[in-house]
């Protein structure tokens, strides 16, 4: 993988990630394909929304279908018939999400299979092996996602263990002869000095890109913005920056304003299945009875298949009848909306008009523009 930075506007960056499997324009949003599928969508449909890279889930793909099945197909690209780049998370966040049914030690994580109760162990070395079999274009180190809230001491211990796991991940990745990219993950909760220690430790190990982890886990938005404003300028400019698990459309905008290049989130797909649709003028909750006879287009500014062919009334009807097509059409739209936001951000940065884009984005959403830290203002 090669990262090329083309231009900047304030702290926002316009670049591209070059892989053997294709080039990804940044800032980029990665749809989440947990089990080797973006729910309800064919790979061709996902690509038509504008997506150039997907996220796969190491933890879930390890449990089902397993490494043997993946190896029999070649890798995840062949298994799911997506020939573009794929980033896989390490499984750390999913293990963190298991809560009481897992035990974290220095060696790794002991937990019970969430489906059959079988005892399982996952560590940095195993995570690297799984991601090697998946053929991931971007591999993430195995880390502990620090819960929120965490005391300073809890956050420090968690971050330090993640650093040690990061070194083990790097060593195993290299031992496997993996020629793809490996990203480090910056931890430290809401404490700036711990984030600094984490980044310094990761830089010493050396990675192809750096993710900001442990955010969007319940902390106030102000804390997320503060940490991004603190951390992003310290990440080497020639390395891509990835904000994990984020977020709402406005979170993408705010991340880009602060220097983030990559995002992923289940929100556009999960919310679509629940009738929660993102539009240029704000959220449409299509289950609301006021849409029963609404013959207007979902989003007049959108060029997706759904908006070009169907009315809000029809989408309301499909949802009311629990028709599978409803979830599919909603997903097509939400994913296209997210990609249109990213395209708008990329174009604005290229033209040196990011402030204008941000102002118009929030005006249409009916929200005030969140302030940047003083040292972030051009």
Swiss-Prot record:
Binding site for Zn(2+): 302, 304, 307, 333
EC numbers, comma separated: 2.4.2.29
UniProt KW keywords: Glycosyltransferase, Metal-binding, Queuosine biosynthesis, Transferase, tRNA processing, Zinc
Pfam families for this protein: TGT
One GO BP annotation of this record: tRNA wobble guanine modification
Enzyme superclass (EC): transferase
GO cellular component entries: cytosol
Active-site residues, Swiss-Prot/TrEMBL: 89 (proton acceptor), 264 (nucleophile)
Free-text remark on how the cofactor is bound: Binds 1 zinc ion per subunit.
Cofactor(s) of this protein: Zn(2+)
Highest taxon, organism lineage: Bacteria
InterPro entries associated with the record: ArchSynthase1/Queuine_TRR, TGT, TGT-like_sf, tRNA_ribo_trans-like
Residue numbers binding substrate: 89-93, 143, 187, 214
Molecular function as annotated in GO: metal ion binding; tRNA-guanosine(34) queuine transglycosylase activity
Pathway where this protein functions: tRNA modification; tRNA-queuosine biosynthesis
Location of region: RNA binding: 245-251, 269-273
Reaction equations catalysed: 7-aminomethyl-7-carbaguanine + guanosine(34) in tRNA = 7-aminomethyl-7-carbaguanosine(34) in tRNA + guanine
NCBIfam families linked to this entry: Q_tRNA_tgt, tgt_general
Function description: Catalyzes the base-exchange of a guanine (G) residue with the queuine precursor 7-aminomethyl-7-deazaguanine (PreQ1) at position 34 (anticodon wobble position) in tRNAs with GU(N) anticodons (tRNA-Asp, -Asn, -His and -Tyr). Catalysis occurs through a double-displacement mechanism. The nucleophile active site attacks the C1' of nucleotide 34 to detach the guanine base from the RNA, forming a covalent enzyme-RNA intermediate. The proton acceptor active site deprotonates the incoming PreQ1, allowing a nucleophilic attack on the C1' of the ribose to form the product.
Family from the record: Belongs to the queuine tRNA-ribosyltransferase family.
Subunit structure: Homodimer. Within each dimer, one monomer is responsible for RNA recognition and catalysis, while the other monomer binds to the replacement base PreQ1.
Protein name (database record): Queuine tRNA-ribosyltransferase
Source species of the chain: Aeromonas hydrophila subsp. hydrophila (strain ATCC 7966 / DSM 30187 / BCRC 13018 / CCUG 14551 / JCM 1027 / KCTC 2358 / NCIMB 9240 / NCTC 8049)
Lineage, top ranks: Bacteria, Pseudomonadati, Pseudomonadota, Gammaproteobacteria, Aeromonadales
């Amino acid at each position: 993988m090669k990262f090329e930075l083309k231009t900047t506007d304030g702290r926002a960056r316009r670049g591209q990630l070059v892989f053997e499997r294709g080039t990804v324009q940044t800032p980029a949003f990665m749809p989440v394909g947990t089990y080797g599928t973006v729910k309800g969508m064919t790979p061709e449909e996902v690509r038509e929304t504008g997506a150039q890279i997907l996220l796969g889930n190491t933890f879930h793909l390890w449990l089902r279908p397993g490494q043997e099945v993946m190896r029999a197909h070649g890798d995840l690209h062949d298994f799911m018939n997506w020939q573009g780049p794929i980033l896989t998370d390490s499984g750390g966040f999913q293990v963190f999400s298991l809560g009481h049914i897992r035990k974290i030690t220095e060696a790794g994580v002991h937990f019970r299979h969430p489906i059959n109760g079988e005892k399982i162990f996952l560590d940095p070395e195993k995570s690297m092996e799984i991601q090697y079999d998946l053929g991931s274009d971007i591999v993430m180190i195995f880390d502990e996602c620090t819960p929120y809230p965490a005391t300073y001491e809890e956050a420090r211990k968690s971050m330090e263990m993640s650093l040690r796991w990061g070194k083990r991940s790097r060593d195993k990745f290299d031992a496997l002869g993996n020629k793809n990219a490996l990203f480090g993950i910056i931890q430290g909760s809401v404490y700036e000095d711990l984030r600094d220690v984490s980044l310094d430790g990761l830089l010493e190990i050396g990675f192809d890109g750096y993710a900001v982890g442990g955010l969007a886990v319940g902390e106030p938005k102000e804390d997320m913005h503060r940490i991004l404003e603190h951390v992003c300028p310290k990440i080497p400019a020639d390395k891509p920056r990835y904000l994990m698990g984020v977020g709402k459309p406005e979170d993408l905008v705010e991340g880009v304003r602060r220097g983030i290049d990559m995002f992923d989130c289940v929100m556009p797909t999960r919310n679509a299945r629940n009738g929660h649709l993102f539009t240029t003028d704000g959220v449409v909750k299509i289950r609301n009875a006021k849409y029963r006879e609404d013959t207007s287009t979902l989003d007049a500014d959108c060029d997706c298949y759904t908006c070009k062919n169907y009315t809000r009334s029809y989408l309301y009807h499909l949802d009311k009848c629990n028709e599978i097509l409803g979830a599919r059409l909603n997903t097509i739209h939400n994913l296209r909306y997210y990609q249109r936001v990213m395209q708008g951000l990329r174009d604005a940065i290229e033209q040196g008009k990011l402030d204008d884009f941000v102002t118009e984005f929030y005006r249409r959403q009916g929200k005030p523009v969140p302030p940047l830290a003083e040292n972030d203002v051009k």
